[in-house]
Amino acid sequence: MKLKTNIRHLHGSIRVPGDKSISHRSIIFGSLAEGETKVYDILRGEDVLSTMQVFRDLGVEIEDKDGVITVQGVGMAGLKAPQNALNMGNSGTSIRLISGVLAGADFEVEMFGDDSLSKRPMDRVTLPLKKMGVSISGQTERDLPPLRLKGTKNLRPIHYELPIASAQVKSALMFAALQAKGESVIIEKEYTRNHTEDMLQQFGGHLSVDGKKITVQGPQKLTGQKVVVPGDISSAAFWLVAGLIAPNSRLVLQNVGINETRTGIIDVIRAMGGKLEITEIDPVAKSATLIVESSDLKGTEICGALIPRLIDELPIIALLATQAQGVTVIKDAEELKVKETDRIQVVADALNSMGADITPTADGMIIKGKSALHGARVNTFGDHRIGMMTAIAALLVADGEVELDRAEAINTSYPSFFDDLESLIHG
């Protein structure tokens, strides 16, 4: 696919699609609750559609009509054995969270995904689930998919310290803990996105959070709710960066989720001197309007507790850093290696091929700016965030063409991405 290059400005206002993390969880909680759940503004990307189909395969009635998703919850014990193996597509969120959901189901399932998912380690979630009494195994010692799982009605509670910062593992264990008899304690290594904690309480569940310690008493019952999904800050991130680095630009992004566990990119933009305004804050929905303008940027250091708050935004932040004066250092981000691709290497290779100066490290990157970018051919390797990062980088290219291979990967999280890009180019 040939990308737009050498644009003179970006202007306009858009609403980014619904938050992917919240969209997944709204389907999961709605399925496990008793009664009806209605979900508004859900993301209809391929990952979330995979989660919806899996729960249909598990016997849940899910209707998509007039822009609203209606889930007829079956309760914690109401899932039924599927006729066939469960297809998780490209979605690491789906396979990990649903492993926890099925921990208390007294039937056997096989879960598989596409080529990318089949390379992602699942031992981080299979190990603690085994401690709870679940029979679960995959391929090689890292438990790569496909996974075979047989849950148990006699699920044991767990006291577990996460060896990595992972909202997916935390959430899988919380879903399992809701079905175990007794008190489970999950201790995070670093604070990660807390959508599961928030939504558990929204659906009538109970937990206590004391710093990084989460305590869940099981078993519990949940009740169907109305869920309004805010815009995804991980999708908004591409426009935030585009507005900062494109010339003569001003972008308004409406209804963006600003949950404090997800706003690391806002902290980075401010540290780099970017012009960013936050208005129309809705404290209940945890959403706001974000406004960015073309800015002179400086390098910064991104590490430690900040990393889990922007892990999915690091590819586009790397592009931002190529347009900042000085050096930007990203470290403590080894988790990038086990995303849809090895994002440390793939981001460095993609942007370096366009003229950037990025040195990959064991746990991040060293990025020297400011770089003039030129044409190149870039492969997404099936990674949606690499595709969108490259499309934004192409906007700055004055010399040559940018070809993007496997651009369809973008449909994973943002099917309307190129439509929104066109509207901003012509805004």
UniProtKB/Swiss-Prot annotation:
Q: Where in the cell is it found?
A: Cytoplasm
Enzyme class label: transferase
EC number(s) from the headed UniProt entry: 2.5.1.19
Which PROSITE patterns is this protein grouped with? EPSP_SYNTHASE_1, EPSP_SYNTHASE_2
Q: Name one Pfam family in it.
A: EPSP_synthase
Primary location: cytoplasm
Q: In which pathway does it act?
A: Metabolic intermediate biosynthesis; chorismate biosynthesis; chorismate from D-erythrose 4-phosphate and phosphoenolpyruvate: step 6/7
GO MF terms here are: 3-phosphoshikimate 1-carboxyvinyltransferase activity
Query: Where, in this chain's numbering, is phosphoenolpyruvate bound?
Result: 20, 92, 120, 168, 343, 385
List the GO terms this entry assigns under cellular component, sorted alphabetically.
cytoplasm
Keywords from the UniProt entry: Amino-acid biosynthesis, Aromatic amino acid biosynthesis, Cytoplasm, Transferase
Q: Which GO terms describe its biological process?
A: amino acid biosynthetic process; aromatic amino acid family biosynthetic process; chorismate biosynthetic process
The UniProt entry, under InterPro entries, shows: Enolpyruvate_Tfrase_dom, Enolpyruvate_Tfrase_sf, EPSP_synthase, EPSP_synthase_CS, RNA3'P_cycl/enolpyr_Trfase_a/b
Family from the record: Belongs to the EPSP synthase family.
Q: How does it assemble?
A: Monomer.
Q: What does this protein do?
A: Catalyzes the transfer of the enolpyruvyl moiety of phosphoenolpyruvate (PEP) to the 5-hydroxyl of shikimate-3-phosphate (S3P) to produce enolpyruvyl shikimate-3-phosphate and inorganic phosphate.
Annotated protein name in UniProt: 3-phosphoshikimate 1-carboxyvinyltransferase
* Organism field: Streptococcus pneumoniae serotype 19F (strain G54)
